[in-house]
Every structure is written in structure tokens, then in C-alpha cells.
Amino acid sequence: MRERLERECEAFEQTLTDPGNQWRTELEIHDHVIDRCEYHDPEGDLIYSSSYGALVNGRAACEGYSKAVKLLLDRAGIENALISGVSENGEGSGGAHMWNIVNIGGDYYHLDCTWDDPVSDDGGKLRMYTYFNLSDEMISGTHRDFSYDFVCKSTAENYYIKTGTYFESYSRSSETR
């Protein structure tokens, strides 16, 4: 198993476009994990809670996604940590959840690849960046009861801010019909 996981990591590392750029490397790790993996959480099967489940088998629960991200970030030399708490879907339901904290450019951010990996109604994958480099304030609407030694207050490396693809304001009256 270890050799197979090592081969998967090495093959991915060969595809990195700019290994010296932390943000670009983090983005490519994010995309690789969500493109490679689909969410699967059967009770009692620990393989789905591992980086092997996510990167080799292509199926994992949140713990497997997070451990795969951690493994690839570690190998890229990017400081990061696993974090556990509770996530809620906005409808009052949720449960125990794991995601990552990552240090990009000297600031810490929340990174949740599991929540960025939705499946569309037709079964296709949609690539999203809603949970890519969030501050504590930004993530607190859906993630809570987490404790860690890092303060995530910057938004400079958030995907939408960094790429300039965000709304500063919105008005229904300005919608084009």
C-alpha cells in the first residue's frame, strides 16, 4: 500500500506547474484531490479515512480528503495542519468534520476540499473554491466548535479575492433579465 501511495504522490508532483509558488501549488493540490476523489463514508471502514482512500482508491470521507491534502502539502513543503470541529449544512444538520489549516505567504487559512467537492444533479463534478483559504470569520457560518493554535484573519489568499472573481455588492434590481 505504501509504495502505491508513494507512486501516486510522485506522479502528481510531476504535474505541478510552479512548485515554488505556494498558492499555485495549494490550488493544484486542491484541484487534484477533488478531481480524484468522491465522497464516501461507510461506517467502520478506515480506508475511507486515509490519504490512501482519497488518492489511490478515489473514495474518502472528510478525514481522508484532509489527510490527502496534508500529505501533498507536507511533501510540497507548505506548513499545514489538520483541524476537527462540527460542520452544518445551513439546514440545522451536520456532524463531526475534518479540514485543513494552511500557511500561505505567512498567513493562516482554512481549506476544506470536502466541502469544495460537490456533485452536480447529473452526477458530474463541479469544481468550486468556496472553502479555499477562508478566514475564521468566513468559515464560521458553516464550521464551528474547532480549537487550534492558529489565527486565520487574512483574506488576501482567498481564491475569489486573489483571482478578482468576487462581488463587492449585489442588487436584485440591477439583474439583467
Regions found by a protein language model. Give the residues of each.
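Low-complexity, Gly/Ser/Thr/Pro-rich intrinsically disordered linker/tail segments
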Residues: 124-177
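Hydrophobic/aromatic-rich core segments of domains that either
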Residues: 64-139
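General structural signal for secondary-structure boundaries
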Residues: 21, 50, 119, 134-136, ...
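Conserved active-site-adjacent core of cysteine acyl-enzyme catalytic domains
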Residues: 46-60, 64-71, 93
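Surface-exposed loop/turn and secondary-structure junction residues enriched for glycine/proline
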Residues: 19, 42, 58-59, 135-137
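Secondary-structure boundary elements
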Residues: 2-54
